């Protein structure tokens, strides 16, 4: 059975135009859209645009990071998916920060609060668990999801810089292996490390049989107990663009990563 997996850091539900000149304080403060000949930067709630892209892509499991907590139900409904949400950092005043973020997402940015959201299509979720990896400098949580099929998913947004990321990844990976026991496992998310910059990925493959990393990316989909059908790859920038007012709006500052595994 093929399992199509996707991981995507949603950048707190914001867009990120390729032209830096469009990322202005004028837009951030006044909510005014900025334009060039091909792209537009908007400062408004984009839940419908993110939901439309996610719903239209082909995947069985989606690992999302920096997901606005207020979006979890809407994204799950749009994708006809079961959901497992764990809150991560800066969620102290959610009713207030959520209201501000809905009005002006670029102004509040990451201070809205965040979550790791795992979405699952075509099967039920049998178990939901989480592990708090650290509280400082930011709260980092790994989300463990066991599906009715037996497949296990661990969704992580690791800390930066490299030393913190390596510790988060190592701790979460050991916990993931223990939690999954002998069942197949997909371990991924925004790991904040490129395989070219750290030996942690070689260690994960050697000691825990978790592989392969995504070339040139900090977002990864590693698997154990599954064959690799299509190796992890970053989607082209244009694949995360939507059209608004005749111009392209590029969602998030991260490209999604997709892979196919065979059980």
Positions of PLM-derived features:
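Short glycine-/acidic-enriched loop or helix-start segments at secondary-structure transitions
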Residues: 17, 72-75, 79-81, 165, ...
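Soluble or luminal CAZymes and related metallo-dependent hydrolases
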Residues: 41-50, 67, 111, 136-137, ...
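Short, solvent-exposed loop/turn segments at secondary-structure junctions
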Residues: 10-13, 68-70, 89-91, 124-125, ...
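Active-site beta-strand/loop signature of hydrolases that rely on acidic residues for catalysis
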Residues: 5-9, 50-75, 145, 153-156, ...
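Metal-dependent phosphoester-hydrolase catalytic domains
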Residues: 124-133, 174-186, 191-263
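Surface-exposed cleft-lining segments at the edges of enzyme active sites
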Residues: 35-39, 129-134, 154-164
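Structured beta-strand-rich core segments of catalytic domains in phosphoester-bond hydrolases
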Residues: 65-149, 237
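N-terminal, active-site-proximal structural segment of metallo-dependent hydrolase catalytic domains
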Residues: 1-78, 85-97
């Amino acid at each position: 059975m093929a399992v199509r997996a996707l991981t995507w850091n949603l950048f707190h539900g914001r867009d990120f135009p390729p032209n830096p000149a469009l990322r202005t304080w004028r837009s951030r403060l006044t909510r005014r859209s900025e334009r060039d000949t091909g792209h537009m930067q908007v400062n408004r709630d984009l839940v419908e645009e993110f939901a439309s892209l996610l719903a239209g892509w082909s995947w069985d499991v989606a690992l999302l990071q920096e997901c606005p907590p207020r979006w979890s139900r809407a994204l799950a409904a749009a994708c006809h998916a079961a959901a497992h949400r764990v809150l991560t950092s800066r969620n102290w005043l959610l009713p207030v920060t959520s209201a501000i973020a809905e009005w002006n997402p670029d102004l509040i940015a990451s201070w809205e609060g965040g979550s790791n959201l795992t979405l699952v299509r075509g099967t039920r979720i049998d178990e939901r668990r989480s592990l708090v990896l650290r509280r400082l400098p930011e709260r980092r949580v790994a989300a463990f999801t066991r599906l009715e099929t037996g497949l296990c998913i661990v969704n992580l947004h690791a800390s930066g810089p490299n030393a913190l990321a390596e510790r988060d990844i190592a701790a979460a990976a050991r916990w993931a292996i223990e939690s999954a026991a002998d069942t197949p496992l997909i371990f991924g998310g925004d790991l904040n490390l490129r395989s070219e910059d750290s030996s942690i990925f070689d260690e994960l493959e050697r000691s825990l049989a978790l592989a392969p990393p995504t070339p040139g990316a900090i977002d990864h989909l590693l698997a154990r107990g599954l064959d690799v059908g299509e190796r992890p790859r970053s989607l082209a920038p244009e694949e995360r663009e939507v059209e608004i007012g005749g111009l392209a709006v590029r969602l998030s500052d991260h490209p999604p990563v997709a892979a196919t595994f065979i059980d």
